[in-house]
Each structure stands twice: as structure tokens, then as C-alpha cells.
Amino acid sequence: MLDLTFETPKPKTIAGAKHDWELVIGMEVHAQVASQAKLFSGASTAFGAEPNSNVSFVDAAMPGMLPVINEFCVEQAVRTGLGLKAEINLKSAFDRKNYFYPDLPQGYQISQLYHPIVGEGEVLVEMGDGTARRVRIERIHMEQDAGKSIHDMDPNMSFVDLNRTGVCLMEIVSRPDIRGPEEAAAYIAKLRQILRYLGTCDGNMQNGNLRADVNVSICRPGAYEKYQETQDFSHLGTRCEIKNMNSMRFIQAAIEYEARRQIAIVEAGGEVDQETRLYDPDKNETRSMRSKEEAHDYRYFPDPDLLPLEIEQAWVDDIAASLPELPDDKKARFIKEFGLTDYDASVLTAEVESARYFEEVAQGRNGKLAANWVINELFGRLKKEDHDITDSPVSPSQLGGIIDLIASDAISGKIAKDLFEIVYTEGGDPAEIVEARGMKQVTDTGAIEAALDEIIAANPAQVEKAKVNPKLAGWFVGQVMKATGGKANPGVVNQMVSKKLNG
């Protein structure tokens, strides 16, 4: 387990015209369950299909069609709860959330207001400066996604695509424990990382598979601590909800703007209205969408078409036993097993595919050397070309082969970089490339000494300078490397130069 010896970060303070203010943030994250079928129908969840091609009679709310729950979606919700160290409710139930919208054919959304499948959990959010925020999870419930209204295809008509209707969402609701824009983005990043490790959501924010509703309020310094002591929300300011955020950068910008908007209102003697707002990234501002609804506005009641959902503890235990190693545990193991720094371990475990790649490369090799090549050479090149690790043209075995050649002194570090470039662009077995192209390191001391003697004889003035200033010995090392095409063993060259100049 990760050693949780972190200090709690200080809350972000914003200076108003009259007072200092602090932020209080809670998040409702909608994560699309990674499942091939929808929550209550067998229709496909494939992204990018032709409009209205993945719609069953249940999704379209045809008369007489009844929902049948998808067991795999339930399993994914339980798996997520376990990954967030949350309580699993063996009995949960579905409710109807009633509202009218063109992309909601039923006229209601099936959700879990009163009895969610997952109870309280937590997420530890590291901030990269030795501090970490423990964000409590209040609940996770399953619900149907709505369809999509399209308003920009025709000036006189709007269109509806029901492909997304009925897709299973997990709504992950946090407590108001987040205290700044950077923490909010870090929380989303950590949550997405855990979901990807679990395989319960792909976390693709561009496709809308992970969206956040951000609740923002302000309070004076000290008020939040009173709330923590009493759990009395009256110590906090009126919150506004910013809907459907699908970018960590926009989440930070929206929170910054909304906090300053609320501060300006309060300091001018006004009151913040509890409302739902939208963020406009082009204008970098939030604007009012509607007054904030409460539960009674939706006339929730138990869904009469669905029995309460009861699951067995033994089934939950089986799911728990199948959980993968999660990010914090993997990071701790990488630090201990491979001797990595905290930073390198964080980079390598950021994505499950990156961690898997590194572990294959490092198996049976020097972990620090493997980490250096994966992070600096491979990741650097992939980032430059806007690729991720799944697109890497260099396989773990190929990169491992390059590292083996370095470790055996068959090639120098400089030649290794040239070899990496060849493997990256052309492919091939590293050892065979080195042999075929004559890239092996020169370790023959006789050949190296002959090259050095020639350079010394041709540069007597430089020799005298180097004897006075030992730092100039590097010039001779560079000349020998140049004379041998970079193939001379640098360690041997350094020793020989030192011996010749000081002998």
C-alpha cells in the first residue's frame, strides 16, 4: 500500500475587494459504463454510429416494452465502488426521475435516488507538492443517459439522436471536500485513472464518456472548518452548479470565473442565487441556464417496472478478488521494487497501458535505466508526435533489447539513441541492427590509445592548457569519440585521457 504520509493542501484563497474568500467545491461525475450493451436493453453502445441506429424498442419507449437490467453494468458499478473503497449496498432500487425533453422518449429517466448501489468511499488526490486531499465519495448510483439534441444542422429544425439513450451511467457524487480549481482537475484526473485501471469506464472526455457537474460556493476563512465540525451547510455560501464539463482545463477556468462572480455579488451586498449554469469557453464565463432544481421538482417515485435489485455478498467478494492492482498500490510497488523516484513512478503509473509497458521493459533489467528510457526517450518522442503508448512503434521487447546492449557495454549511450531512432522509424531487432551496421562499441584499448596519441601529438598547445585546467580534458574525450564515430567506450576514453595528461 502507498504510504499516506501527506499533508493536507491549503485551500485556495481569492482576494476580493473587501475580504479574502475560500472556495468549496463538490463534484458529480457522470462516467459511462464500459459495456457493449445498454443498461436496460441489448442495443449497442458503440460511439460514432449512424444517428438512431443503436436504438431498441425499449430505448425508444415503444408501448409495452419493459426494461431488463444488464447484469454486467451492475458488476461494473460494484467494481467501481470497490475500487473507490466504498460500501456496496446489497439491496438497491430504481426510481423514475420525471421531466420532459425531446431526447428523453420515456418522459422520465430511470435512476437511483433513494437506494443507490454504492455508498460512501474516498479518493486520495495527490497534488504533486507533497500534499494530498482526501475527497470523500457520498454515493454512486446507476442511471440511464439521455439522447442528444442537435440544433446546428438546419436553421428551422432541431434533430434528435437516440443512440446514447439508455446507455448506463455511474453518477459518482463527492462531498464538498475540494478546495480549489487545481484540486478539482486533479480529482477528475485521479478518478479517471482509477476507472481506467478498473476497466469500468474509458474516461474519454472528448466523446462525453466522462462529464462533470461542478458545484461551486464561496465562504470566509474559518467557515469551512465550522461546517466540518457541525456538517451544517449554513456555514457555507449558496452553491451554483456548472453543468456538463468535459475538459479539465475548462473545469479550472469555470471555477475561477464562477468564484469571482459570486464574490463580486456578495461584496456588493447581493445574494447568490442557487442555479444551474453553463460555461462558455469562448467567452470564459458562466451564464445562467435555469434555477437549481430540488428532488421534489422531478417527482421521483419507485419504478414499478423494476423490482428492487438484490445482490449476494459472495458475488461482491468474487468481484473484489478479481480487482487489478490499482494506481496507488502500483506506484508504491514500482518505488520499492525498481528503486524509482516518486515522480518517475507517478509518470509511469498515470495510465494503465504505460505501467504495463514499463513493467515488461524493466523485467529482469535495471529499473532506473528502464524508467529513464521509457520516460525520456519513448514518451518524449510519442508526445512530440501526439501519440500515446498504445501507438508505440517500439515494442517492450525492442526497447528492452536496446537496454541490454547498453548494459553489456556493446553500445554507448550515444549509439543507443541512434539505435532507438532506427528501431522507432524502421523497426527490427536491435542486436541484429547493431551487428549489421557496425554500431558496436569500440572497447579495444589499443585502437582507442592510438587515436588518442594521434590527437595529442597534433595538439600540443591544447595539452598544456589541459594540464593547467583539468576541465579541458573533455575536449580530448570529444575528439576521440569523433575519431571513432562515437563508438569508443566513454569510460575507457575518460580513464585513458586522464592517464595520458597527468602521466
Curated annotation (Swiss-Prot):
EC identifiers of the protein: 6.3.5.-
Biological processes, Gene Ontology terms: glutaminyl-tRNAGln biosynthesis via transamidation; translation
Pfam families (alphabetical): GatB_N, GatB_Yqey
Classification via InterPro entries: Asn/Gln-tRNA_amidoTrfase_suB/E, Asn/Gln-tRNA_Trfase_suB/E_cat, Asn/Gln_amidotransferase, Asn/Gln_tRNA_amidoTrase-B-like, GatB, GatB_C_1, GatB_Yqey_C_2, Gln_synth/guanido_kin_cat_dom
GO MF, one example: ATP binding
Keyword Lyase: no
Keywords: ATP-binding, Ligase, Nucleotide-binding, Protein biosynthesis
Reaction(s) this enzyme catalyzes, per UniProt: L-glutamyl-tRNA(Gln) + L-glutamine + ATP + H2O = L-glutaminyl-tRNA(Gln) + L-glutamate + ADP + phosphate + H(+); L-aspartyl-tRNA(Asn) + L-glutamine + ATP + H2O = L-asparaginyl-tRNA(Asn) + L-glutamate + ADP + phosphate + 2 H(+)
Principal EC category: ligase
Coiled coil: none
Subunit annotation: Heterotrimer of A, B and C subunits.
Its job: Allows the formation of correctly charged Asn-tRNA(Asn) or Gln-tRNA(Gln) through the transamidation of misacylated Asp-tRNA(Asn) or Glu-tRNA(Gln) in organisms which lack either or both of asparaginyl-tRNA or glutaminyl-tRNA synthetases. The reaction takes place in the presence of glutamine and ATP through an activated phospho-Asp-tRNA(Asn) or phospho-Glu-tRNA(Gln).
Family: Belongs to the GatB/GatE family. GatB subfamily.
Protein name per UniProt: Aspartyl/glutamyl-tRNA(Asn/Gln) amidotransferase subunit B
UniProt organism field: Ruegeria pomeroyi (strain ATCC 700808 / DSM 15171 / DSS-3)
